[in-house]
Amino acid sequence: MSGCGLFLRTTAAARACRGLVVSTANRRLLRTSPPVRAFAKELFLGKIKKKEVFPFPEVSQDELNEINQFLGPVEKFFTEEVDSRKIDQEGKIPDETLEKLKSLGLFGLQVPEEYGGLGFSNTMYSRLGEIISMDGSITVTLAAHQAIGLKGIILAGTEEQKAKYLPKLASGEHIAAFCLTEPASGSDAASIRSRATLSEDKKHYILNGSKVWITNGGLANIFTVFAKTEVVDSDGSVKDKITAFIVERDFGGVTNGKPEDKLGIRGSNTCEVHFENTKIPVENILGEVGDGFKVAMNILNSGRFSMGSVVAGLLKRLIEMTAEYACTRKQFNKRLSEFGLIQEKFALMAQKAYVMESMTYLTAGMLDQPGFPDCSIEAAMVKVFSSEAAWQCVSEALQILGGLGYTRDYPYERILRDTRILLIFEGTNEILRMYIALTGLQHAGRILTTRIHELKQAKVSTVMDTVGRRLRDSLGRTVDLGLTGNHGVVHPSLADSANKFEENTYCFGRTVETLLLRFGKTIMEEQLVLKRVANILINLYGMTAVLSRASRSIRIGLRNHDHEVLLANTFCVEAYLQNLFSLSQLDKYAPENLDEQIKKVSQQILEKRAYICAHPLDRTC
């Protein structure tokens, strides 16, 4: 393998991989055990933990049979009985539809069986998400109920809390909502103003505050609510910290506003929820007092990955619908399917669906392992990739359909409206990119602390080691991270893509060290840098997923595995080239880096709060 030697054949890539001396200045239960391993974090060190991701996860035949038997009635219901157009127009899911969803068990998919749920694994939950995605409003309603609404009880609840609340939540008799966002705090969850004050008898907390954009807010009986509480620190000082509570509507003082009139997912119930002197028993604290922020992040981190299967299911149906149109519609005496620009759109949709599907089921498989790894970064990457791919691919589908895609007589414009929220839901993609990059950099920083300190102090042995690395890179260093060869885990038909993945990973690790040396702790403020770091990592994880999945498909002889190889290789080449450019941009002095210009343009606009260029028809005299 040519390693960074190939990488260094272009000027931009050479800059990206410069030396580091830049300056001296058995039951299917939802597993809730503590995380013990991580895959994505090791990529920041230029390492690939093969055992975490190769071979691609598999489910047992019994589990596969079970989920397939369950899918049939659900798919039949969505196909024959769900009127998505009516739901969208009326802005409400009919009561009879909700009752049918409850009877199918869809409100308790991941609730453990001993509490009345189905106890689906993450993999089975993802598979069902492909079917539920047939209606965006229903998808959001169910996800808000169990992916975030009741998830805190599963993850952090006591046995008493689980026994009290989960059975009715699993059956759908009670519906759950997640109450975090407030009028003055969106992505900045730590700045919430709702307050819970301990009563004099210390038996209740009195909750006051308002929450906004609460899905299921007008339907819910049970709310997971986050509020400021006074906490006595170890030094005796009193501080405000966030605490999570399980709040019943029946506690009193709980009201909600009218449903919001939204762009998309119009049938889901989204409204403000108000708490006025709501008495919460101390037994309803979720987790520990003052640990609410951690509880909130664990809830959100645990559910994001499933967006990938939802979007993949949507895109696969969209491909079928638009392919039928493209193969029958004629223009200029040729079918649309014969035009290269139309073919490009189908290739894009298929590739995006394949990558997000692979990322989702790889992540779900890791989470389903005993002592599951820390997959918070992986889940965030799936969410970012799939939400952006959804918006891009649905837009391309409308382009294929022309005017048909723009009219309300067909479902396409509704699908476009429904998908826009995905880039905002469960953490905006901007915030998640910061999370992805900073979490990984923090991991790398802890491990590289000594080396970076020695480089800053110009320790001779460390500097010479760095110079030696730089020299070997410039001469064409061989990068072999064990993916190919006699003992490799990637099929030979994917070897070139595996080599590209190894090269990118190695050079990413080198670049991370450079960034930590250059910025230190101030890297937290460098959002344009962090965005590129996150984008590289998302590509690397996508490459990982498709290489693992396609290798498995070849090995076991799945139908159309040659098509998978084609999709995997195409994505890996594109991701590799994107990564080269991003790596070059991370060099402060590279011509590809326009950070200062971007900041200057933005500053000038925001100072005037307007577009400041003169009109092209203006004159000076």
From Swiss-Prot:
Q: Which residues carry this modification: N6-succinyllysine?
A: K92, K521
Cofactor(s) needed for function: FAD
How does the protein's chain sit in the membrane according to the entry?
Peripheral membrane protein
Q: Which GO terms describe its cellular component?
A: dendrite; mitochondrial inner membrane; mitochondrial membrane; mitochondrion; nucleus
Post-translational modification Phosphothreonine, affected residues: T478
Feature: transit peptide: 1-37
Protein's cellular compartments? Mitochondrion inner membrane
> Active-site positions, per UniProt?
E426
Q: Which GO terms describe its biological process?
A: long-chain fatty acid metabolic process; medium-chain fatty acid metabolic process; mitochondrial respiratory chain complex I assembly
PROSITE patterns given for it? ACYL_COA_DH_1, ACYL_COA_DH_2
- Provide the catalytic activity annotation: eicosanoyl-CoA + oxidized [electron-transfer flavoprotein] + H(+) = (2E)-eicosenoyl-CoA + reduced [electron-transfer flavoprotein]; octadecanoyl-CoA + oxidized [electron-transfer flavoprotein] + H(+) = (2E)-octadecenoyl-CoA + reduced [electron-transfer flavoprotein]; oxidized [electron-transfer flavoprotein] + hexadecanoyl-CoA + H(+) = (2E)-hexadecenoyl-CoA + reduced [electron-transfer flavoprotein]; decanoyl-CoA + oxidized [electron-transfer flavoprotein] + H(+) = (2E)-decenoyl-CoA + reduced [electron-transfer flavoprotein]
Protein family per UniProt: Belongs to the acyl-CoA dehydrogenase family.
Can you say what this protein is called? Answer: Complex I assembly factor ACAD9, mitochondrial
